């Protein structure tokens, strides 16, 4: 369908309102290991969905200069930091990415010590697997000797962002290392897509699930890593090759609606919009910055259509799968419930904002 720039801007306004208005409804009971209640829905909680959401807001603010949005972001961090930060793990690191990107642009003195302390502790103390990968420990579970593709977005991008902004290459070096280790064990050489996880204890990829959102973390993650930090030329070339292989596979699996399924290669699994938004963002951005052909852009625009079709009048993105643990069979992924979330909102925001960066016959009209 033809989409105007005005339509995209209106949808973006609704998405921001929908995200900041999210509240847990008691549907999910997921207590943390320290006994505190886990809240992966409400905007005011410090967790990974909110961290991804804030990254989307910071990227949107950086593009628009919206002072009201900036105030919302800074107020969120001021309140959460004053209340006391949670224990460090992979998922509680996610909000640090948006804070780093905000600090990189504004250099607020109050945020720099928080960022530096967290980044230093990640490198020094975050549990590692064999070969030095970050073990995917989260607030409610220890995942011994496991690599998950989510970790690259939740942790490695923060290290790259803050390392570049602070002039400390050791953090960028660690981000590079994590992308390389995770690619070694999670990238499927046969399909070009990525498996959800790897266990060093069993030395296998669990269900060998080619999971949609997990793959979108990689698409977004590689492109944003290259965009935000000066990484080694050899690592850059290697990761771009990995990305090209992934996208070649994705282009063959896009549904007629423009969406992708939660199990990318399984036509019986449902179409899932957070993954679709991440792929749309990556495809449009990759084409715009000259890393891919026009085919990427056209597939990204079809994904943009699919995302817009799932933004409700209340600004809430529909058909987003809830937070997904490691599955030991493929049915596990098919059965994940659909639930509005901060990351669903954020990935949609990233996709729509990138759509505005791609002027064409679909988005130029006012």
Question: For each of these PLM feature ranges, what is it?
Answer:
Residues 56-64:
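A short, Lys/Arg-enriched amphipathic alpha-helix followed by its capping loop at the start of a domain
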Residues 70-72, 82-199, 204-208, 314:
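Extended ligand-binding groove/face enriched in aromatic
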Residues 19, 60, 73-76, 80, ...:
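Alpha-helical solenoid scaffolds that mediate protein-protein interactions
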Residues 4-49, 63, 67-68, 79, ...:
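CBM-like carbohydrate-recognition segments
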Residues 149-153, 157-262, 269-280, 294-322, ...:
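Extended ligand-binding clefts on enzyme/binding-domain cores
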